[in-house]
Structures are given as structure tokens and as C-alpha cells.
């Protein structure tokens, strides 16, 4: 019979735990790196890459930065638009839901299809809502600029555009329709 010390038992138990923690840190850093590179490059394609492809892409990008031969970086100085950030987050969440459902034993295929089609419909509705909101805002801005340019300035006005601005009405969902929020 082989004698094992408390230290050996502790190491046997602790080693897998430490390995899981190390992998969790690596995955967290990879996700952070992925979003940072996507922000700097202005390319959302990297968000859909697997870990190895993303690391290779990050290495190529860093080499380009080091040598000064940076290929076109369209949005390097400007932060991503809130809508783009939301889209990326939503798609990452949908991918995570899909992954979890696929790895859950006993998960009904019909339930998975139902959830994924629901998420797709919601995403499509959100895009349509945003497009309608953008259109109404641009029409209101055009109408406002026409009204402001044609209105005579009074002696009390400063002559700035903000003097004639009125608050633009924000589109509200219908009474029966609830506005979806990701939180």
C-alpha cells in the first residue's frame, strides 16, 4: 500500500482547479483582446472568429502596428457607434445562447429552433425600429432646418441654430407593444 501525504492529496485536488482558473483567465483575456482589436480595426468579423484565428489576426495586427505598415484602419480615431456595439453584443449573446442550448443534454430541437427564431425576429424588429427612428429624426431635422432658416431673427435671439430648436418627439411604442431591452 502506497502512502500519500496531505500535500500530495492537496496537489491532486488543487491542480485541476488551478487549471480551470487559468483557462478562465485566458478566455476572459481573449474576449477582451477580441473586442479591442475589433474596435481598433473597425472590423466586426473578428468577433465571429474562433480563438486561434483571433490570436493570429491579433498577432498580424500588432506586427503591422510595430512596422508602421498599418493597413486601412477606418475607425481608429472614432469609437464604435452605440448601435454597432449593441448589435455585436446581441449577436454574441445569441451565439452564447445557441452554444449553451447545443451543449445541454436533453434539449429539445424544437425548443432550440423556437428560441433562435424568436431571437432572430426580435433582432429584425429592432433593426426596423431603428431604421424608422432614423428616418423620422432625419425628416424632423430637415423640417426644423427649413423652419429655422425661413424664420426672421428677433433682436433677442442670438442667431444660433439652437434658438429655434424644439425638442424632437421620440417615437414611442404602441400601448400594447412593450419595448424590448436586453437587461
From Swiss-Prot:
InterPro entries: bHLH_dom (IPR011598), HES_HEY (IPR050370), HLH_DNA-bd_sf (IPR036638), Orange_dom (IPR003650). Residues 152-183 are annotated as: Disordered. A motif (WRPW motif) lies at residues 180-183. Keywords: Developmental protein, Differentiation, DNA-binding, Neurogenesis, Nucleus, Repressor, Transcription, Transcription regulation. SMART domains: HLH, ORANGE. Gene3D superfamilies: Helix-loop-helix DNA-binding domain. Disulfide bonds: none annotated. This is Enhancer of split m8 protein. PANTHER family: BASIC HELIX-LOOP-HELIX TRANSCRIPTION FACTOR, HES-RELATED. GO terms for molecular function: DNA binding; protein dimerization activity. It is found in: Nucleus. Pfam families: Hairy_orange (PF07527), HLH (PF00010). Residues 10-65 form the bHLH domain. The keyword Transcription applies. The keyword Transcription applies. GO terms for biological process: cell differentiation; nervous system development; regulation of DNA-templated transcription. Transcription repression requires formation of a complex with a corepressor protein (Groucho). Forms homodimers. It comes from the Eukaryota. The gene is E(spl)m8-HLH. PROSITE patterns: BHLH, ORANGE. Its main location: nucleus.
